[in-house]
Amino acid sequence: MNERITILSAYSFVNIIEPANLIPKLLLVGKKKYIRGTILLANEGFNSSFSGSYENVNIVLKQLIALTGSKDVNVKINYSPVHPFQKLKVRLKREIIAMNVKDLNVDVFKGHYIEPKDWDEFITKQNVILIDTRNEYEIDIGTFKSAINPRTETFKQFPAWVQQNHALLQGKKIAMFCTGGIRCEKSTSLLKSIGYNEVYHLKGGILQYLEDTHNKNNLWQGKCFVFDDRRAVADDLYPAEGYWLHR
């Protein structure tokens, strides 16, 4: 029986002085350990998702942490019967998640985390407005019940949606969610930076929520879009039937 493939996703907002210098080192260790996936590097940190054996993905993660000097890394692991990536790519970017807002400091302006176990209770309270920060093609296959769909095609359009919807947001407790948490680090930071105080986000995103709660209250409806060949995962975090991208 073949060993199942481990998929490790990790991100960290950490100041990297010369991120380009890390590319050959990460490619070397990644290829040596038969890793596939994508690692994005920028001055603001790293964002990655890669697959391989459980031992090898953790070796690459340790190297990534050591090279970047990160002290606070958000990590998620799930599994697949086969690799969901075709090859290893390490890329230099201006942002690890592109929103095109200059000088946004996610360490200074940070939303309040809501643990997955507390999420259902929180989002069903009065005066809480729930926003899906993902793109419309992701929301089309699954989202939380009663979540607002900003109808964006890219995350870069989200700041404009916020500017156009101050009347909707004013005076509310704002709860936001995304796939794995990284987009909400920036979306909550954006709202905090322009004066909203009661800004919250789902810690670890939809994937952590499904892992921790098993969607016991059925507030999550549909599948969760993912950016690899699986295209979508079900409540058990295994590839959703009928979505796999065959190359």
UniProtKB/Swiss-Prot annotation:
Catalytic activity: uridine(34) in tRNA + AH2 + O2 = 5-hydroxyuridine(34) in tRNA + A + H2O
EC number assigned by the record: 1.14.-.-
Active site feature: 178
Gene3D superfamilies: 3.30.70.100, Rhodanese-like domain (3.40.250.10)
GO function terms (MF aspect): oxidoreductase activity, acting on paired donors, with incorporation or reduction of molecular oxygen
Every Rhodanese domain range: 124-218
GO biological process: tRNA modification
Record carries keyword Oxidoreductase: yes
Keywords: Oxidoreductase, tRNA processing
Domain of life: Bacteria
UniProt record similarity statement: Belongs to the TrhO family.
Function, in words: Catalyzes oxygen-dependent 5-hydroxyuridine (ho5U) modification at position 34 in tRNAs.
Stored NCBIfam families: PRK01415.1
PANTHER family per the UniProt record, alphabetical: RHODANESE-LIKE DOMAIN-CONTAINING PROTEIN 7-RELATED (PTHR43268:SF3), THIOSULFATE SULFURTRANSFERASE/RHODANESE-LIKE DOMAIN-CONTAINING PROTEIN 2 (PTHR43268)
Protein name: tRNA uridine(34) hydroxylase
Organism expressing this protein natively: Rickettsia prowazekii (strain Madrid E)
Taxonomic placement: Bacteria, Pseudomonadati, Pseudomonadota, Alphaproteobacteria, Rickettsiales
Gene from which this protein is expressed: trhO
